[in-house]
Amino acid sequence: MRKIEPSLVSIVIEAAPRKTPLYDEHTRLGAKMVPFAGWLMPVQYTSIVEEHQSVRNNVGVFDISHMGQFIVDGAGAQAWLNGMLTNNVDKLNAGMGQYTFLLNDRGGIIDDLIVYRIEEQKYLLVVNAGRADEDFAWLQNHLSDGISLTSRSADFGAVAIQGPRTNELFHALFGKDVELPARNHIADVPFDATNVSVARTGYTGEDGIEVFFYAKDAAKFLTAVLERGKPLGIKPCGLGARDTLRLEMCYPLNGSDLSPERNPIEAGLGFFVDLAKPDFVGRDALVKTKESGPREKLVPFRMKAKGPPPRPHKQSGNQQDHPAAPA
């Protein structure tokens, strides 16, 4: 069979980074834009250190519109998702979310994600930007009859508002009588003649929310966030601070700490795997790992003093240490 090479046109299309609904706002705010996971994203506005400290001490806002957003709908959606994801979807009531994994047949991590139950048989999956296309294809290939899987990524934007003053900014945006969702919960909240979805989640180690809205409302919402957050010391924050914040908390990064060659038990994240479930993709491989012990273990460490980046180190016998994401 003749090998079909991709055309020049397809290569150009694939290589061109996409822009989030907030791209013009980023350039207006003076952000330094870089390609990331197929998107043009702000890496910083002022300095990574300033943005990092703003989130730790006050509040910051990040564009997370590049992340994939999928809707799973239909009778049997709960049972189907429980067979595709490692955590127990049965534990979710409407309005609740949980961290979980999408695995291949060998138990390797395709992606880590958050699944929200937004109605009785309707779910929102928020996945990593760099894995979104692969995730969608994998789920599509395993789809059961009666289940609808759609991507709303092109029609929606999202921001993460993170920091100890998130609660104050939430009420400044939505009203003092509107209740902030509980941790790992999601709710629709009125905003300027429309509704936005507010989830009490984040990737920084601080209190925070992630807000999902129609792409057409993106600029208006970010403007409101920055204006009403000004008395609270808010700063727009880029990917640089997002990375240092998650690294400081030892949160894993897909593509570095997590990969299809490493399973959740080896990644030290077995807490988000429910082996009591009778079946899910990758379960058999995880049971074997549990019984025999992991071939490797991802563990956090902190440098005691300044020094060169850690390198692979053979400690004893066949054991060898490999730093996954040095700071």
Mark where each language-model region is.
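Acidic, proline/glycine-enriched N-terminal capping motif
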Residues: 2-103, 108-110, 240
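Conserved, structured C-terminal
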Residues: 2-37, 42-43, 118-327
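N-terminal, helix-rich and Lys/Arg-enriched segments in bacterial and organellar proteins
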Residues: 86-87, 111, 247, 262
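Well-ordered mid-protein domain cores that form the structural environment of catalytic cofactors
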Residues: 88-142
